Amino acid sequence: MIASLTDWNQFLSQHPSAHLLQTGEWGELKSAFGWEPVRVISGDVGAQILFRKLPLGFTVGYIPKAMNSDQLSVSSEQFWNEINSICKQHRAIFLKLEPDLWNDQQLETWNLKLETSPHNIQPPRTIVIDIKGEDEQILAKMKQKTRYNIRLAEKKGVTVRAWDDIESFHRLMLVTGGRDGFRVHSLEYYKRAYELFHPKGMCEILVAEYEGKPLAALFVARNGNRAYYLYGASTDEERNRMP
C-alpha cells in the first residue's frame, strides 16, 4: 500500500537501522527540489521511491539506500509487484535502486532481473566506524598520526562547536567545491535540510574555528542507531592548524 508520511515514519520507527535517505524527512527535502516521494509498505518491508518528471509525461524512479537484503528478498514478491505497479502509474522509464548492502554479492539473494548501472548517485563505498565508548577509547582506535593532528589542532587554538550559520556554511561549501571539483547544493537546499532535520534532533552542523573565524565545518545527520557525514567543507586558510 502507499503510506502517508505519518504511517511511514511509524513504520520506520520499527526499523532503527533504516538509512537516513529512506526517512520521511529526506523525502520531504527532495520534494522541495523537483522529486515526488512515494512511500510503499507491504507487510514488514517498505521503501521510499523518489520520482522525477521528464518531458512528455514520463518520470524516472529512484530508491536510495533501500532496506537490507533480509527485508527486501525474493520472498517479498508482493512488495516488488506493488513497486512495479506504482512505477507504471508514474510512467517511469526505469527504476534506479541503490540498496543499503554490505557487499554486492547480497544482491544475488534477491533473484531479481537487475542490470548494473554505469552511474552512481550515492558513493559506491561507505566506511562505517563504531564510535561507542569514551573519547579516549575512540582516540585509541585511531592511527597515531590522526591522534597527533587532533591534539595539534587543539594545541594551536582550534575549537569546535555547534553552528547554525547556514549562509557561512554554504560559503565554505562553495570554496571546497571549487577547490576539489564537486557540485555544491544551493543555499536554499542546506537551509531546508537544516529546517527539516534539526528540530527533530536529526542533524547538527559543527564548525572548527580559530579566534572566531570558521576554518572547517561538518553537516552530520542521524537516524536510528547511525549517524552520517553528509557534507564537509573547509577554507584554504590556516590549514597548518589541522582544523
Predicted regions and their residues:
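Short, basic, low-complexity termini and linkers enriched in Ser/Thr/Gly/Pro
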Residues: 44-45, 66-92, 104-119
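A conserved beta-strand-loop-helix scaffold within acyl/acetyltransferase catalytic domains
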Residues: 2-57, 99-104, 111, 115-241
